[in-house]
Amino acid sequence: QVHRGPVQHACYPHRAEAIVDSGKFDWNAHADKFPGLTTPDESYHGVTYTERFGLEGAFITKATVQLMRDLGSIPSPNNCFLLNIGLETLPLRMKKHCENAQAVAEYLQGHEKIAWVQYAGLPGDKYHERAQKYLPNGTCGVVIFGVKGGRAAAEKFMAGLKLASIATHVADAKTCVLHPASSTHRQMTDEELAAAGVSPDLVRFSVGIEDAKDIIADLEQALANV
């Protein structure tokens, strides 16, 4: 998996005719929620908009019956102002996110207490060639990895971080960390976690735009106590 935003993804050279970005990530350096068009909407008896209304009608139907209902017909002036402010620095921030994430992935890959690292910017990653082709402006800012020792070790590592914030969202200007098995996926059994691809040792690390040396130093001191 690769978390990628509109800055990294070279859509048009690969025959994309139109690009729609939700603004969920990256735009203003903070996270928000934009429900998908291909997932069931429980507020309307589980309807999936793309299946019910087709590709041409899905977006406008969802925008009318759900988003306009919940959020109003247009963003508030203040939200538009904040998004515009964020867009002014979007290329600079995304470049830093990607550079820092690459440095973090390379550091973790060689650490004795890390079992595995998944980041498409690493030459050995199974998605590396695709990232090189489709993400010429940088891979992404999210690194996932496993801490040796399983769930207990992963939780202890996360609790020992001082710079990174424990948070469920990604693509924030600050570094955020999450242990899915004990948080977002805690309601699942071990069998369900395995089926979902969430191992007990998995840590999701959303790399911010702080100095890379500070981020790595935080990782180092937290891993030293595991």
Residue ranges and their predicted role:
Residues 5-142, 146-176:
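Active-site C-terminal subdomain of aminotransferase-like
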Residues 93, 152, 159-160, 175-226:
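PLP-dependent enzyme catalytic core of the Aspartate aminotransferase-like
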